[in-house]
Amino acid sequence: MLIIETLPLLRQQIRRLRMEGKRVALVPTMGNLHDGHMKLVDEAKARADVVVVSIFVNPMQFDRPEDLARYPRTLQEDCEKLNKRKVDLVFAPSVKEIYPNGTETHTYVDVPGLSTMLEGASRPGHFRGVSTIVSKLFNLVQPDIACFGEKDFQQLALIRKMVADMGFDIEIVGVPIMRAKDGLALSSRNGYLTAEQRKIAPGLYKVLSSIADKLQAGERDLDEIIAIAGQELNEKGFRADDIQIRDADTLLEVSETSKRAVILVAAWLGDARLIDNKIVELA
């Protein structure tokens, strides 16, 4: 497994792979890898000749400096996991390598609408940071496919739109959420939970599933469903942050023509902001 930290070396390797006619898959990450990331790697390996995993804690997508400062940096452990998975190349640049003149004056990519709604409304600048770094990685790695987790549902929708709008010749693969046996979606943020909070955490998925059951049973008073769900979360020990029921294909309000709904839930548990989602077919 090759570990590359600089842009010139990455470009050199990508040129070589292209000359050899290899099909390249990219898995963008911020490190602190868990089994959910490994599922992305496995999907990439099944679809391509060469797998490139990027590990970069992107300062542009953090709206709170304290969150950036405390995000775990576990490069050595991450590389050991990826080596066992027989990943071909790890791109682990420094912030200086990606943003040589800092982030304030760096050219950015913005996806109107999707970047400022829902999660974007509560995290200003977050999705602009995501679309900027992902587009830069696409330009550097020139992958044939790129794999993203469906846990970050809005992020996946945003990247799909960016790829379509910008004309990137890249297949975007959404990989289903990987869950612990008790239903909790795997996430790097789970590491912020205490042992006691970890016992409470599966309650998020239970509330999510309860909303899904109501929708499948034909209930359509969304305001009431959301209000009850928020109360249930708070009673379980969470601080409900945002609960939305949207059209799964547009992320707009559910309408009579909507065929699928996506339930998007975000809640605080201690210092961890947990997110999850579930898609429901509407009769």
From Swiss-Prot:
Q: Which UniProt keywords apply?
A: ATP-binding, Cytoplasm, Ligase, Nucleotide-binding, Pantothenate biosynthesis
Q: Which SUPFAM superfamilies match?
A: Nucleotidylyl transferase
The yes or no answer to whether the keyword Transport is present is: no
What exactly does this protein do? Catalyzes the condensation of pantoate with beta-alanine in an ATP-dependent reaction via a pantoyl-adenylate intermediate.
| Subunit architecture | Homodimer.
Q: Other remarks? A: The reaction proceeds by a bi uni uni bi ping pong mechanism.
Q: What is this protein called?
A: Pantothenate synthetase
Q: Which organism is it from?
A: Shigella boydii serotype 18 (strain CDC 3083-94 / BS512)
Gene this protein is translated from: panC
